[in-house]
């Protein structure tokens, strides 16, 4: 009996981890819909990948997609329905950091490494995140506009795209949704006790309550009240948006029990966002979302997996 053809959509796929996710899924025989906000870059990425994989053009298609634009989201759903009739795998990979850099950009990676160490300390029982002062002569600035873009791209975007594609995923015998998140979405790094309480209360968790946390955060940063309201001192929008995405992952998994829906941290990789620092290549980072995208039936759902735990699943 012939194997049923599977179709996957990957967001933010014209470069970096998203591009490598497309490559690895295509190598598994899956027809991949490579999407990106910028049409020119997306088409160029498709041609590059087709050449590198040496496969027929119908194995990899491109469609413009801006996850922050409702019309763009609706258009890609119509495209998939008309061309393929269903969707098997959705990888919500597109994301932004929400910060502006001034001076030496290596300060960005100092903060990332400090946050990883802080999370390890908190997981080991530390009462609070240790203070950190970077050595590099640079500054990381978080403004309302960047924070809003971060929240819309990292949380609202994946949520709205997922909701738009649910009817097509329901036509798959083994629907999979992978939300590319971050360990920085850990509630241990969220600081604000009210937000931690809301997002950590799984029995009462709803989309409306998650949205409320996000909107209160945006209101506070707009009014210059981040410190007063006890939000994180840096990567605030990144932490809040990824914590919200992790919470939505649990909600969606509970609502659609036949799906396998999980969030993952791919690890600290050399991408444009990290100014190409980090120990992992984008190919290594992509292994994690691909692993979750190909999760066997009966696998876990509604979970967040750090890189090491995801790789050990099967």
UniProtKB/Swiss-Prot annotation:
CC per GO annotation: cytoplasm; membrane
How this protein's activity responds to pH is stated as: Optimum pH is 5.5.
List all disulphide bridges recorded for this chain: none
For the keyword Heme, the answer is: no
In terms of InterPro entries, this protein maps to: NAD(P)-bd_dom_sf, SDR_fam
Q: In which pathway does it act?
A: Secondary metabolite biosynthesis; terpenoid biosynthesis
User: Which family is this protein grouped under?
Assistant: Belongs to the short-chain dehydrogenases/reductases (SDR) family.
Protein name as it appears in the record? (-)-isopiperitenone reductase
What is the scientific name of the source organism?
A: Mentha piperita
């Amino acid at each position: 009996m012939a194997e049923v053809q599977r179709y996957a959509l990957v967001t933010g796929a014209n470069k970096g981890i998203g591009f490598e996710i497309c490559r690895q899924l295509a190598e598994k025989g899956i027809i991949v819909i490579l999407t990106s906000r910028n049409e020119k870059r997306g088409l160029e990425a498709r041609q590059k990948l087709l050449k590198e994989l040496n496969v027929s053009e119908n194995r990899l298609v491109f469609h413009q997609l801006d996850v922050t634009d409702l019309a763009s989201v609706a258009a890609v759903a119509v495209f998939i329905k008309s061309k393929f009739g269903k969707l098997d795998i959705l990888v919500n990979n597109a994301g932004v950091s929400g910060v502006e850099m001034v001076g030496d950009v290596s300060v960005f990676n100092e903060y990332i490494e400090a946050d990883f160490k802080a999370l390890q300390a908190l997981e080991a029982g530390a009462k609070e995140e240790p203070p950190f002062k970077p050595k590099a002569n640079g500054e990381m600035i978080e403004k309302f506009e960047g924070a809003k873009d971060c929240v819309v791209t990292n949380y609202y975007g994946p949520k709205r795209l997922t909701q738009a594609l649910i009817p097509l995923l329901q036509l798959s015998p083994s629907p999979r949704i992978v939300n590319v998140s971050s360990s920085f979405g850990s509630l241990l790094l969220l600081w604000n006790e009210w937000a931690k309480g809301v997002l950590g209360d799984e029995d009462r968790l709803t989309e409306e309550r998650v949205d409320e946390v996000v909107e209160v955060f945006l209101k506070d940063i707009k009014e210059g009240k981040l410190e007063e309201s006890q939000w994180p001192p840096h990567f605030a929008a990144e932490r809040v948006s990824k914590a919200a995405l992790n919470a939505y992952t649990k909600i969606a998994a509970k609502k659609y029990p036949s799906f396998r829906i999980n969030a993952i941290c791919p690890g600290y990789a050399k991408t444009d966002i990290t100014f190409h620092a980090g120990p992992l290549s984008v190919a290594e980072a992509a292994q994690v979302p691909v692993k979750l995208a190909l999760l066997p039936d009966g696998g876990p759902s509604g979970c967040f997996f750090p890189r090491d735990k995801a790789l050990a699943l099967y």
